[in-house]
Amino acid sequence: MTTRLEPLSPAKASLMTRLMWRYTKRRFGEVPEPFAVYAHHPGLMLAGAVHEGMLDRASGALPASVRQLAVYRTARTVGCSWCVDFGSMLMRMDGLDLDRLQQIDAYATSPHFSDDERAAIAYADAITTDPHAVTDEQVADLRKRFGDKGVMELTYQIGVENMRARMNTALGITEQGFSSGDACRVPWAT
């Protein structure tokens, strides 16, 4: 599938956009396709990049596996193949066990997930369901596990992934090969 908005070519991109692409290519091996599509609105692309950087730096209240599994589950539930692909690569880069992702549909009973991870994945499901199905009891349990700061971080991360996944899906952005190491779909990058 091709994207609904053509990725912006470097010839049409501003200097700032090309610098951002250079940074992401060095960091991830390829320019993430959403960046090439979002570049049609450089101001929003820059705002998103700054937000992502700040979000990454600010997120430390939760164990990485708890946060990343909840985000992965959200992307998968929404159906964003690009988010699943990129998220899998990030988890691999962080040294997390990717084999567990094959068990995520059975998280409630699978021995591959801790109780904290199960609670976070269930919360991601409850938030991502439309209408959401979050309960007072669920949040009370999460507060005991992670504290108020951890619940806020988990809620924010799941909410942001809902936004990312829904934007990418709406724009027709699909997997790019990051999880396989074969990232090459941006047309002008080959």
Which positions does each model-derived feature cover?
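Hydrophobic alpha-helical segments
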Residues: 1-190
